[in-house]
């Protein structure tokens, strides 16, 4: 399964580090070139309630290529129309964009890519970006939990795929 975290800032970098550490193939995508360069050259450094460094693969949006089975969307919601339209060609035929954003952005995203490609997820932990490539996990590692929901068009297989991917993070 090919996965991307689009908007890999503080939360996305922590999530991507855990997922990569546990064997997932995930691209961390961020428009901040300094952050992307630091991630690629030094790895994702996570401090705070943990202390780890994980080699990760990071890209800027213009470096994206190919198709993804799952794109975890972690940008600000006000950017969704532009970002989701940009991401649509990068989804496989049964690919899913999973929102990890404040609010209820899924109906607007479904208008662009369809309910069969839209899932929602709430994150119950916090992080902060300290400097390019370095994030602080502000929650206890054993509290890294998610609450998922799906639109009517999402299959049980798609839901299970995302559930297993997120369970693999820690």
Residue ranges and their predicted role:
Residues 87-104:
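ADP-ribose/adenylate-binding Rossmann-like module
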Residues 28, 72, 99:
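Conserved SAM-binding loop
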Residues 66, 100, 105-170:
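Rossmann-fold dinucleotide-binding core
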Residues 1-47:
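NAD(P)+-binding Rossmann beta1-loop-alpha1 motif at the extreme N-terminus of oxidoreductases
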Residues 50, 54-91:
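Rossmann-like NAD(P)-binding element
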């Amino acid at each position: 399964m090919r996965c991307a975290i689009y908007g890999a800032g503080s939360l996305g970098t922590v999530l991507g580090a855990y997922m990569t550490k546990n064997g997932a193939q995930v691209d961390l995508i961020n428009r901040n070139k300094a952050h992307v360069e630091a991630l690629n050259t030094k790895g994702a450094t996570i401090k705070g309630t943990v202390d780890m460094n994980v080699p990760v693969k990071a890209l800027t949006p213009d470096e994206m290529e190919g198709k993804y089975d799952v794109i975890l969307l972690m940008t600000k919601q006000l950017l969704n129309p532009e970002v989701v339209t940009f991401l649509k060609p990068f989804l496989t035929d049964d690919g899913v964009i999973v929102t990890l954003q404040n609010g209820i952005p899924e109906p607007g995203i479904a208008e662009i890519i369809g309910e069969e490609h839209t899932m929602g997820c709430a994150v119950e932990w916090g992080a902060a970006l300290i400097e390019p490539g370095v994030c602080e996990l502000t929650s206890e590692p054993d509290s890294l939990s998610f609450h998922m929901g799906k639109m009517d068009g999402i299959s049980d297989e798609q839901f299970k795929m995302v559930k297993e991917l997120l369970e693999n993070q820690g």
